[in-house]
Amino acid sequence: MTNQSQTPIGSEKIHTFFIEHLNRIYCAKSHLAERLPEIYEGAGFADLKFAIKETIISTEKQLARIDKIYELLGLQYSFEKCQALITFLENGFADLQLHSEQLQVRDLMIVSYLYQLDAVEMSSAQILQFVTTEIMNQQIKQLLKDNYNEAKAESVLLLLLIEKYS
């Protein structure tokens, strides 16, 4: 059996896997932090504006936690392997601009956009939850758990919004 070098996340391979997913979440959250204020201004329905405002607040908290994780690991985020995700997110945002004159269609597009973004975030967040058994640092574990719980709450809010539109 080979002796793999250990990191605060576990083996080197697990560490790399973990960082790639953390970068993906950070990329998506950074995109949200940048674009949500613009989306908020274009939303028409009060419930949608409320959901966007709550997501802005939650996103800022989650980014701060992820920044702390990077700090604890002595790393900085990298969008190096996130280009496809960035393109996907920007294309979705551009689609919203195409429907800026039709309020109802635009609001539905916003809900669709947020739902797609939520799916991307939650899949990586769930993967990170699986990896937490390998993490040696309890503070990192707690930060991940807090982010995951807050992301789940965002998902519930989004599902309630979708139900209301149905």
Each language-model region and where it sits:
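Amphipathic alpha-helical hairpins
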Residues: 1-166
